[in-house]
Swiss-Prot record:
Cofactor note: Binds 1 Mg(2+) ion per subunit.
Pathway of action: Purine metabolism; AMP biosynthesis via de novo pathway; AMP from IMP: step 1/2
Protein name: Adenylosuccinate synthetase
Organism: Gloeothece citriformis (strain PCC 7424) (Cyanothece sp. (strain PCC 7424))
Class in the EC hierarchy, top level: ligase
Residues holding GTP: 12-18, 40-42, 304, 330-332, 412-414
Residues forming the catalytic site: 13, 41
Length: 449
């Protein structure tokens, strides 16, 4: 039995969907613990592409139970659309479960999200406009509507009427927008309730029972560490906690049941939206990374900003999450480069800085200090073991493991499941593996007398 968290070690879009899909074949349960439709993950199976926002990647395995947890925010229209798309591809959703305590994204959340972003002007955050922030704001303000409310028809009408009257005042007076019709919204969401009712459960209890039965549970993170509300590049962050600790809170479990944390990072770095990005490349190499990596958001379609691998934020992610091993994705995107840079530290106001500064103004002033490594100038997409990799590619991976101070368990060389190298058992491998002088993972137990 193993309970494993998969989280993003950068700014999201690291390829968690593929890694979770790979690991789901060994999982009995997959849990999505936070975020909403602002997160997208893509899985490619036998040439067929699945783009999901709310439903866990494990849905492609019919014997794997998939839970949308309490810490998520759910847009019912998007969820039902995803379910219909899966049905059209002959994928069952009978193994899907929805937490009764997850919060619901309402029409006024989307309207306020977009209007608020437009009103910010030069201070815009780069929100997806899907209503995620306002939904979480209502959750904190204790005025939100939860799945359990949606299922309670008697109270739903009164609650929606009161909330819409309150939100209409904001829409009209602050944003000069037309008010919403409470009856229309009530009818719409009652329809969603009937379609989703059979999927709704006490998710924390179900997860607890799976733990008691010693099942393998995979907790699937959305977004990435640097987008965490408390520990990311605030204010250019999401409205939830996509770190390992947030997975426990969002799933409704204690941290002591977690056996392993797997961090996912690209072989370079990307970011969507606004905010500082020390290793960003605006020239030809940045364009090459974007084009070869197909760096366009699953949710918004926006072009992602691309840059060199940043080991400073990588080490920060390892520390914040207690990462035991890494999955490095999109190594193949670097195949055509003569040289590859890795940021190992920053220069901040004339001083060497080897840690991530929490002050956004300081972070914006950080200049990357690079280590240059040779490229390999040949395709890696058909490599299926470390021995198949060009020496320079293997040296690059060893260097990343060294500067990140954690071992690499998985290397991804393309979107398909089979374009993967398993270096060590990512589920049952050693806790926080160390490296010997040859870059080979060894457990802490092996290093103790």
């Amino acid at each position: 039995m193993a309970n494993v968290i998969v989280i993003g070690a950068q700014w999201g879009d690291e390829g968690k969907g593929k890694i979770t899909d790979l690991l789901s074949r060994s999982a009995d349960v997959v849990v999505r613990s936070q975020g909403g439709v602002n997160a997208g993950h893509t899985v490619v199976v036998q040439g067929q592409t699945f783009k999901l926002h709310l439903i866990p990647s494990g849905i492609l395995y019919p014997d794997t139970e998939c839970i949308i947890g309490s810490g998520t925010v759910i847009d019912p229209s998007v969820l039902l659309e995803e379910m219909e798309q899966l049905h059209a591809l002959n994928v069952s959703t009978e193994n899907l479960f929805i937490s009764q305590t997850a919060h619901i994204t309402m029409p006024y959340h989307r309207l306020i999200d977009r209007a608020s972003e437009e009103r910010r002007g030069k201070y815009k955050l780069g929100t997806t406009g899907r209503g995620i922030g306002p939904t979480y704001a209502d959750k904190s303000e204790r005025t939100g509507i939860r799945v359990v409310d949606l299922m309670n028809g008697d109270d739903l009408q009164e609650k929606i009427e009161w909330t819409i009257n309150y939100k209409n005042a904001i829409l009209e007076k602050l944003y000069n927008l037309s008010p919403l019709d409470p009856k229309q919204v009530i009818d719409e969401y009652r329809g969603y309730a009937e379609q989703l009712r059979s999927y709704v459960i006490d998710s924390s209890l179900k997860i607890y029972e799976a733990i008691q039965q010693k099942k393998n549970i995979l907790f699937e993170g959305a977004q990435g560490t640097l987008l965490d509300l408390d520990h990311g590049t605030y204010p250019y962050v999401t409205s939830s906690n996509p770190i390992a600790g947030g997975a426990c809170v969002g799933a409704g479990i204690g941290p002591t049941v977690i056996d392993r944390v797997i961090g996912v990072a690209k072989a370079y770095t990307t970011r969507v939206g606004e905010g500082p990005f020390p290793t960003e490349l605006n020239g030809e190499i940045g364009e090459l990374l974007c084009d070869r990596g197909a760096e366009f958001g699953t949710t918004t379609g926006r072009r992602r900003r691309c840059g060199w691998f940043d080991a400073v934020i990588g080490r920060y992610a390892v520390r914040i999450n207690g990462i035991d091993c890494l999955a490095i994705t999109k190594l193949d995107v670097l195949d055509e480069l003569d040289e590859i840079e890795v940021c190992v530290a920053y220069e901040l106001d004339g001083q060497i800085c080897d840690h991530f500064p929490s002050d956004a103004n300081q972070f914006a002033r950080c200049q990357p200090i690079y280590r240059t490594l040779p490229g390999w100038k040949q395709s890696t997409t058909n490599c299926r073991s470390l021995e198949d990799l060009p020496k320079q590619a293997l040296d690059y991976l060893k260097f990343l493991a060294e500067v990140m101070e954690v071992s690499i368990a998985i290397v991804s060389l393309g979107a398909s499941r089979d374009q993967t190298i398993i270096v060590e058992d990512p589920i049952h491998g050693p806790k926080r593996a160390l490296l010997d002088e040859n870059g080979v993972p060894v457990s802490k137990a092996d290093t103790q007398e």
